Amino acid sequence: DMDTMVRFYRDILGLETEWTGGDFAEFKTASGPVAFWLYSRMQFVKAFNEKYVPPKGINQSFELALWLPTYANVDAEYERLLRLGLSFPAGEPITYDFGIRNFYVADPEGNLIEIGSMNKA
């Protein structure tokens, strides 16, 4: 459902897009030439001559990682998304021994999004 997915990435996660409908949406990123695209699964499978199968549950084969400047930004984003009523498959933010602080949220189709930072300060 492109409407639901675009609303999630635009309105909840704050990614910019000029999408006005249709089967394809491009989002701007702060990192310059890197692009983030959504493409209707129902249209995408046609390129492979496959049958469309709606997703169920958490997609365990794909993750999108969004990195923030500091641990404090990670905690603030977690609190903001919590206030919006989102759920977190792995729970609250955690800091690992190897220096990453992160948490996970799932988009409306079950794709995991890791939100984290490697910068304590």
Predicted regions and their residues:
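Vicinal oxygen chelate
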Residues: F27-A30, N49-A121
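Core segments of cupin and vicinal oxygen chelate
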Residues: D1-V45
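Residue-level marker for the onset of beta-strands and adjacent loop->beta junctions
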Residues: L13-G14, D23-A25, F62, P89, ...
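N-terminal beta-strand motif that seeds the catalytic metal site of vicinal oxygen chelate
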Residues: D1-V6, E63-L66, M118-A121
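A short, acidic/glycine-rich surface segment
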Residues: F44-K51, G91
